[in-house]
């Protein structure tokens, strides 16, 4: 089974076993929802059940049902929390996990020709931008917006695009 990193446990918070985590997921509200099952990267057989959680400054505080005091919580310091693929959940239409977009072939929707591959993803603002690398090594960013990204076929690892003028530097 595949697991995905969601947070790093930084320290304890209070005396009742609550931990402060640095978030490594785009979906903390879902990942840390009451009843959610998480594991430790170092021991995926150990399941921790979220009892409650809340944002705290730029971090999150999580209380697990199985961790009831500061001594138990202290042993988790530095651990990476992971979610299993089966617990990862479905995303709304038009939202994708980064791992599903990396290495997708980029296809010109009009011509059907392969343009390149997605090799990086950044989130500078309202929309993600995807770095396309052509076979000759030329790279450029495309925004993940409806005017450009027309269709994503995760199963086939293909992204169909209509490139706006100026997105791709033509020699």
From Swiss-Prot:
Residues 93-167 form the PRC barrel domain. It is found in: Cytoplasm. Keywords: Chaperone, Cytoplasm, Ribosome biogenesis, rRNA processing. It comes from the Bacteria. GO terms for molecular function: ribosome binding. Pfam families: PRC_RimM, RimM. Coiled coil: none annotated. Disulfide bonds: none annotated. One of its GO terms (biological process) is rRNA processing. GO terms for cellular component: cytoplasm; ribosome. Belongs to the RimM family. The PRC barrel domain binds ribosomal protein uS19. Binds ribosomal protein uS19. An accessory protein needed during the final step in the assembly of 30S ribosomal subunit, possibly for assembly of the head region. Essential for efficient processing of 16S rRNA. May be needed both before and after RbfA during the maturation of 16S rRNA. It has affinity for free ribosomal 30S subunits but not for 70S ribosomes. This is Ribosome maturation factor RimM. The gene is rimM.
């Amino acid at each position: 089974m595949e697991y995905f990193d969601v947070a790093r446990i930084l320290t304890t918070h209070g005396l009742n076993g609550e931990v402060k985590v640095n978030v490594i997921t785009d979906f903390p509200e879902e990942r840390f929802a009451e009843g959610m099952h998480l594991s430790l990267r170092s021991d995926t057989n150990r399941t921790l059940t979220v009892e409650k959680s809340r944002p705290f400054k730029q971090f999150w505080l999580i209380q697990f049902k199985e961790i009831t005091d500061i001594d138990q919580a202290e042993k988790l310091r530095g651990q990476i929390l992971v979610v299993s693929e089966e617990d990862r959940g479905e995303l709304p239409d038009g939202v994708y996990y980064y791992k599903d977009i990396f290495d997708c072939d980029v296809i010109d929707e009009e011509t059907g020709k392969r343009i390149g591959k997605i090799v990086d993803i950044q989130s500078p603002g309202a929309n993600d931008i995807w770095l396309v690398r052509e076979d000759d090594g030329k790279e450029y960013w495309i925004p993940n917006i409806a005017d450009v990204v027309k269709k994503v076929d995760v199963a086939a690892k293909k992204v169909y695009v209509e490139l706006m003028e100026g997105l791709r530097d033509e020699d």
